[in-house]
Swiss-Prot record:
Gene, per the UniProt record: rpsM
Organism expressing this protein natively: Levilactobacillus brevis (strain ATCC 367 / BCRC 12310 / CIP 105137 / JCM 1170 / LMG 11437 / NCIMB 947 / NCTC 947)
Annotated PROSITE patterns: RIBOSOMAL_S13_1 (PS00646), RIBOSOMAL_S13_2 (PS50159)
Full protein name: Small ribosomal subunit protein uS13
Short name of any one Pfam family annotated for the protein: Ribosomal_S13
Family that this chain belongs to: Belongs to the universal ribosomal protein uS13 family.
GO molecular function: rRNA binding; structural constituent of ribosome; tRNA binding
Quaternary data: Part of the 30S ribosomal subunit. Forms a loose heterodimer with protein S19. Forms two bridges to the 50S subunit in the 70S ribosome.
NCBIfam families: uS13_bact
GO BP, sorted A to Z: translation
Length: 121
């Protein structure tokens, strides 16, 4: 089970789909990495030669993935909160950030509904 960017890739999947287990690499980026590394698309992770593995690892190192990407995203959110932007306030209050309506839904962000005592007559 090869380790690339600190992630164990699944042995039985093709290399492009195995790379998507790395945070920050989607299927399109994975196909680009495989093509740039010169590895055939139909090779399974278990069948990679050490040379091919090194080429793929070198291509993945060009991208910001896993811990570095998670850190950047959290720092971006923290920066939005510190400058007092609207998006930062929404993050701080745990509400939807991208303009969704919240009158009826948004339960994922707002959490479980709390009933108000004495509301019904």
């Amino acid at each position: 089970m090869p380790r690339i960017a600190g992630v164990d890739l699944p042995r039985d999947k093709r290399i492009a789909y195995g790379l998507t287990y790395i945070f920050g690499i989607g299927i399109n980026t994975a196909h680009k990495i495989v093509a740039d590394a010169g590895v055939p698309e139909d090779v399974r992770v278990r069948d990679l030669t050490p040379d091919q593995e090194d080429k793929v690892r070198a291509e993945v190192d060009k991208y910001k993935v896993e811990g570095d990407l998670r850190r950047e995203v959290s720092l971006n959110i923290k920066n939005l909160q510190e400058i007092g932007s609207y998006r930062g306030m929404r993050h701080r209050r745990g509400l939807p950030v991208r303009g969704q309506h919240t009158k009826n839904n948004a339960r994922t962000r707002k959490g479980k509904a709390v009933s108000i005592a004495g509301k019904k007559k």
